[in-house]
Every structure is written in C-alpha cells, then in structure tokens.
C-alpha cells in the first residue's frame, strides 16, 4: 500500500501534482490509496495516468457489447445522474446504478459492468464508489459522451453479426418485464 506522502511526492516528480499539495489533492490521494491498497507507489504511475486521461480505450469486442439502445440510454442516464451530484464521494452507486438500470431492463450485474466499461474500458477494478471521485465529474461526462458518440457513428446501433468465435453475437440488452 502506498503511503500518502510518498505517493504525493511521486506524483509531483511525475508532473501530476503541484507543490505544495492542495487540500483537495490529499482527499484524492487518500481515495486512491483506498482504491488500490495492493499497489506500490511505483505501480501507481500508469493507474494515475489512466485516471487523469480524458478518454479510455475500450477493447473492440467490449465496445460491441455496449452497442444497444438499452445500454446507450443507460450510460446517458448515468451521465445525467453524475451531472446532478454536487459531490461524487459517498454516492450509493451500488443502489442507484441498478435502480437507474431498471428503467432500461438491465440487470444489476449488467449495469455495473456497462458503467465500468464505459468509464475505464476494463471489466475489473476498484469499487465504483471509489472510482467516481477519482475520475471526477468532467472526466466521467467526457468518457460517457465519447462512448455514446462512438456507438452512434459508423454502424450506429447495428451490432456485429458474429463474434470472433464465429457464433452469433449479441450485445448487452435489457429485459422487458412481462406484460410491460
């Protein structure tokens, strides 16, 4: 686990942080240490660079999984949710994201996966409750906008016919309630 002072000094060396360290940066550093307790200070550099980037790379097949109306509108709703929050720390995302997803028929698991893929391009990582304040409002909204833009250009919401295994490919879809 990186110590906060050592991490702050390393971030200054890497050009990620000014000197003296602003009070808000200490909160960010504490959140980073909580999110990545198994990493060393030197391991932190690529993680911090990825968190500070305005975009992330979503592997092609994972992006294809997002290519449906349900996920597109869900991700847009997550952006609206974030935009309405004055503070991203302490959000009850484990409760709120599945609740937002219900409107689009997405399962809890799909809601959390879609959110993580849209924001990081990865299936695994720290808790979203820690990831949101690490990314911040602007980066979350920029990344969501980029995903939605990418999905709507080119083929639009027309998914791949077949996956790399030659079998029919299906993106993540919501399930409509019976009788609804």
Model-assigned labels for residue ranges:
Residues 1-180:
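Conserved nucleotide- and phosphate/pyrophosphate-binding catalytic cores
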């Amino acid at each position: 686990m990186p110590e906060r002072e050592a991490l702050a000094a390393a971030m200054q060396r890497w050009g990620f942080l000014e000197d003296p360290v602003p009070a808000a940066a200490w909160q960010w550093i504490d959140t980073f240490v909580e999110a990545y307790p198994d990493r060393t200070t030197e391991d932190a550099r690529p993680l911090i660079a990825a968190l500070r980037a305005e975009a992330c790379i979503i592997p092609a097949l994972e992006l294809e999984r997002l290519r449906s109306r349900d996920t597109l509108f869900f991700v847009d709703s997550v952006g609206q949710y974030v935009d309405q929050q004055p503070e991203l720390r302490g959000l009850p995302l484990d409760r709120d994201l599945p609740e937002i997803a219900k409107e689009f028929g997405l399962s809890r698991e799909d809601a959390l996966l879609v959110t993580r893929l849209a924001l990081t391009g990865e299936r695994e990582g720290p808790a979203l409750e820690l990831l949101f304040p690490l990314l911040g409002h602007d980066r979350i909204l920029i990344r969501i906008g980029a995903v939605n833009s990418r999905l709507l250009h080119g083929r639009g919401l027309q998914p791949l016919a077949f996956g790399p295994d030659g079998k029919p490919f299906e993106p993540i879809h919501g399930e409509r309630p019976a009788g609804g």
